[in-house]
Curated annotation (Swiss-Prot):
Organism: Haemophilus influenzae (strain ATCC 51907 / DSM 11121 / KW20 / Rd)
Membrane topology: Multi-pass membrane protein
Subcellular location: Cell membrane
Record's keyword terms, sorted: Cell membrane, Membrane, Transmembrane, Transmembrane helix
TM stretches of this protein: 12-32, 49-69, 90-110, 126-146, 151-171, 188-208, 210-230
One Pfam family matching this protein: TerC
Main location: membrane
PANTHER family tied to this protein: COILED-COIL PROTEIN (DUF2040)-RELATED, INNER MEMBRANE PROTEIN
Protein name per UniProt: UPF0053 protein HI_0056
InterPro entries: Integral_membrane_TerC
One GO CC term, this protein: plasma membrane
Length: 237
């Protein structure tokens, strides 16, 4: 079980995989922060930690169910000459959920009224938020687990890389969430990014591959432009 410790390639895989898991977890952090942002202030930090803990647990359970994951790629049925597998269905449903949820959040932000926000926050339950996080964690975990399987040959290395990545994300989640909450335009940008991720998940379910690098580059470029705008607005005050 621990023979990988003496293998230099295993350590290289561990570092590389942990870094990739952090990058692949960015959309997960954004989604969790958007959801816990609707909770009362005192519950937000515990919501973030529990949400990321659920993400880690989901990834580890999926890793330990590798045989089941491999079966998900087997065709279940065919629609218009397109073979549909279990993985495709999960990605399709997850993508639709992300688009609907994020679009609803954008609409609410545009039609924002203080009394309406207050009412909506009271309607959101802690358990309800955790259930939504758990459901989307399954979708977000698929890419993460498939990447882990493709990059490392030792299960302990994969699990350790995921634990390191989630640990880093737990520290980063609050500062990112607070910063996004302080700048409403960044929140809209984050929600638009989640819509884009939802579209890419649906495309992936239809065997149309959109490189994630393109999505992350577009998001990164947009964030840089928005940071310049924020800086300019501060200087003009």
């Amino acid at each position: 079980m621990f023979e990988w410790i003496a293998d230099p390639e295993a350590w290289i895989s561990l570092v590389t995989l942990a870094a990739l898991e952090i990058v692949l977890g960015i959309d997960n952090i954004i989604f969790i922060n958007i959801l816990v942002g609707r909770l009362p202030e005192r519950q937000r930090q515990s919501g973030r930690i529990l949400g990321l803990a659920l993400a880690m647990l989901t990834r580890i359970l999926l890793l330990m169910s590798l045989a089941w994951i491999m079966k998900l790629t087997a065709p279940l049925f065919t629609v218009f000459n397109q073979e549909i597998s279990g993985r495709d269905l999960i990605l399709l449903i997850g993508g639709l959920f992300l688009i609907i949820k994020s679009s609803g959040e954008i609409k609410e932000a545009i039609n924002h009224q203080e009394h309406h926000e207050s009412e909506s926050k009271n309607k959101v339950s802690y358990l309800g938020v955790l259930i939504q996080i758990a459901v989307l964690d399954i979708v977000f975990s698929l890419d993460s687990v498939i990447t882990a399987v493709g990059m490392a040959s030792h299960l302990p290395v994969m699990i350790l890389a995921i634990m390191i990545a989630v640990g880093v994300m737990m520290f980063a989640a609050k500062p990112i969430g607070d910063f996004v909450d302080t700048h409403p335009t960044l929140k809209i940008l984050a929600l638009a990014f989640l819509v884009l991720v939802g579209i890419s998940l649906i495309a992936e379910s239809l065997d149309i591959h959109i490189p994630k690098g393109y999505i992350y580059f577009a998001m990164g470029f947009s964030v840089v432009v928005e940071m310049i705008n924020i800086r300019m607005r501060r200087l003009m005050k």
